[in-house]
C-alpha cells in the first residue's frame, strides 16, 4: 500500500447548501480521499471541516495531523475515533501527561546555529518565529497522538469499541495559537527541496508504505534550513539514535496508557464502523505508532534544538 501525504486539491464552487446533504458529503469524501490518501484541511467541508476545527481547538494546535486527515477519507472513521479521543483528552490532565512523556529524554545532540547565521538561510526574525511555532506544534501534536492513539488501540483490543471516556466540557488548551503557513505540496517546492523531502520521508515511513510527514512539507518553506538539518537527521537515523529514543518514547507511552484511569460511558458515537473497517484502521494507526509518530517526535525535538537559544 502506498500512503501519500500530498494534499487533496479541490476545484469548483462548493456551497454550504451542497454539503448539508449527507449523501453528497459522503460522495465528496470518497472523491477527494482514497486508500492511502488524505482529505486536506483546505479541502474539508461540512462534517469534516467541523471535526477538524474541534480537533485543532481541543488539542491546542493550528493544524490537523496527517493521521486524522487520513481517517477523514473513510465515512464514519474520523467521527468514531475522534469521539473517543475527544473524551480522553478532556478527562485527563493532558499537559501533565505530556510533560511526563518527555521528561528527561536525551534527544540526539545537535549544535545550535548562531542567530546571526539565520539570514544566510533566508530566515529573518519573523520567519524564525514561524519556524519555531511549526516545530513546537508538531512536537506537541505528535506527542499527544502517541499517548491518545495508544490509549484508543488499547481500548479497542479490549473490544470496548462502544465505550470511551465520558465527555467533559471543552477545555481551552491555549489562549492563542499562532497560525501556521500552509503545508506545501511537492509540486510547490523547488526541485532540490522536494528531493530532500522525499529522501527524509523514505526513512520514517511505515514498513511497506510511503508517506511524507507533514513536518517536512512545512519545513520546505525554509529550504536553506531544511538543507542544513537534513544531514543531521539522516545521520541520527543511520547511527540508531532516532530508533533508540523513539523506542523509549513508545515504551513510556504504553506504560502510561496502562496506568490511565479514564471515566467511561456506554455510547460515545451513534455509528461504529464495520469490523473490517475497524480492523483496517487499527492496523493503520498501529503502523503510525510503531514508526513515524515516535520517530517524528525525536526528529522534531532534535530540529528544534538547532534553533538559536534565546540569548544567542
Identify the residue ranges that each predicted region occupies.
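Hydrophobic alpha-helical segments
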Residues: 1, 6-312
Amino acid at each position: 500500500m502506498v500512503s501519500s501525504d500530498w494534499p487533496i486539491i479541490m476545484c469548483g464552487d462548493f456551497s454550504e447548501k451542497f454539503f448539508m446533504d449527507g449523501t453528497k458529503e459522503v460522495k465528496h469524501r470518497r472523491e477527494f480521499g482514497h486508500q492511502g490518501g488524505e482529505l486536506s484541511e483546505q479541502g474539508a467541508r461540512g462534517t469534516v471541516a467541523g471535526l477538524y476545527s474541534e480537533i485543532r481547538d481541543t488539542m491546542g494546535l493550528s493544524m490537523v495531523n496527517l493521521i486524522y486527515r487520513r481517517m477523514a477519507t473513510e465515512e464514519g472513521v474520523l467521527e468514531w475515533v475522534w469521539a473517543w479521543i475527544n473524551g480522553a483528552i478532556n478527562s485527563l490532565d493532558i499537559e501533565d501527561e505530556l510533560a511526563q512523556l518527555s521528561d528527561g529524554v536525551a534527544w540526539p545532540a545537535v549544535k545550535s546555529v548562531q542567530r546571526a547565521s539565520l539570514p544566510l538561510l533566508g530566515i529573518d526574525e519573523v520567519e524564525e518565529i514561524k519556524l519555531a511555532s511549526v516545530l513546537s506544534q508538531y512536537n506537541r501534536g505528535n506527542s499527544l497522538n502517541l499517548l491518545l492513539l495508544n490509549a484508543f488501540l488499547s481500548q479497542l483490543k479490549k473490544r470496548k469499541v462502544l465505550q470511551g471516556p465520558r465527555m467533559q466540557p471543552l477545555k481551552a488548551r491555549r489562549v492563542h495559537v499562532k497560525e501556521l503557513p500552509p503545508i506545501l505540496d511537492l509540486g510547490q517546492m523547488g526541485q532540490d527541496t522536494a528531493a530532500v523531502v522525499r529522501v527524509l520521508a523514505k526513512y520514517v515511513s511505515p514498513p511497506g508504505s510511503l508517506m511524507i510527514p507533514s513536518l517536512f512539507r512545512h519545513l520546505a518553506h525554509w529550504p536553506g534550513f531544511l538543507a542544513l538539518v537534513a544531514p543531521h537527521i539522516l545521520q541520527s537515523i543511520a547511527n540508531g539514535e532516532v530508533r533508540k529514543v523513539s523506542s523509549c518514547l513508545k515504551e513510556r507511552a504504553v506504560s502510561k496508557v496502562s496506568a490511565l484511569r479514564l471515566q467511561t460511558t456506554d455510547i460515545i458515537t451513534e455509528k461504529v464502523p464495520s469490523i473490517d473497517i475497524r480492523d483496517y484502521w487499527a492496523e493503520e494507526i498501529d503502523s503510525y505508532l510503531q514508526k513515524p509518530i515516535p520517530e517524528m517526535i525525536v526528529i522534531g525535538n532534535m530540529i528544534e534544538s538547532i534553533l538559536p537559544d534565546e540569548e544567542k
